[in-house]
Regions:
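N-proximal low-complexity "stem/linker" segments adjacent to membrane-targeting elements
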Residues: 1-23
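Short, acidic, metal-binding catalytic loop of nucleotide-sugar glycosyltransferases
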Residues: 22-31
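A conserved acidic beta->alpha catalytic loop
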Residues: 38-47
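Glycine-rich, basic loop-to-helix element that forms the pyrophosphate-binding segment
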Residues: 63-76
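Short aromatic/hydrophobic "clamp" motif used to bind/position activated sugar donors
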Residues: 81
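The conserved acidic donor/metal-binding loop of glycosyltransferases
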Residues: 85-89
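Conserved donor NDP-sugar-binding/catalytic core segment of glycosyltransferases
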Residues: 93-121
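Conserved nucleotide-sugar donor-binding catalytic segment
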Residues: 127-172
Length: 172
């Protein structure tokens, strides 16, 4: 399978960092890179990140004051992109499932949602409201990296209200 680049923006995240990284390292896929981008932590977050990078060579640590999302995308070498915040990674097969869903369905985006399952190539959910349920949030989605090639400042697309139409067009 192709590599997944996982972009983890951090800022004073020492309380959650170990849980996040441990959850990633327990995933059933190994072909991944974990790109941690610190945007100016004033606590021990950056030191913790560097310690993790010495323990596992798939973990890369960067510092920037610029857009952490765009910075992470520029550093990513994988075919697929996952943005991660404080998501609980209780399912050790989450990345594997998301990647398989992308490949099997020739999709651009795979959305992880515990309320959905794929049954014989049909997506079955409790409810779907494309504007509210799938609006703008980066954190539970696996993207094909080439989806971002036509956007210069992807962080702005997902943060500003004026870009809502662009966000929706990505999912429709």
């Amino acid at each position: 399978m192709d590599k997944i680049s996982i972009i983890v923006p951090v800022l004073n995240s020492k309380e959650h960092l170990n849980r996040i990284i441990m959850g990633l390292l327990k995933q059933t896929i190994n072909d991944m890179e974990i790109i941690i981008v610190d945007s100016g932590s004033s606590d021990s977050t950056l030191d913790m990140c560097k310690d993790w990078s010495f323990l596992d060579n798939r973990i890369k640590v960067y510092e920037t004051k610029d857009s952490v999302i765009d910075f992470g995308l520029k550093k990513a070498t994988g075919k697929y992109i996952l943005f991660l915040d404080n998501l609980n990674l209780n399912d050790n097969t989450m990345l594997e499932k998301m990647q398989k869903a992308l490949i099997q369905n020739n999709a651009d985006i795979s959305i992880y949602n515990s309320n959905c399952s794929i049954i014989t190539n049909y997506l079955v959910c409790d409810s779907i409201n494309i504007i509210n349920d799938f609006d703008g949030c980066l954190w539970n989605k696996l993207f094909k990296k080439n989806l971002f090639n036509s956007y210069n400042n992807i962080e702005d697309v997902f943060k500003t209200a004026l870009k809502k139409a662009v966000r929706i067009s990505l999912f429709v």
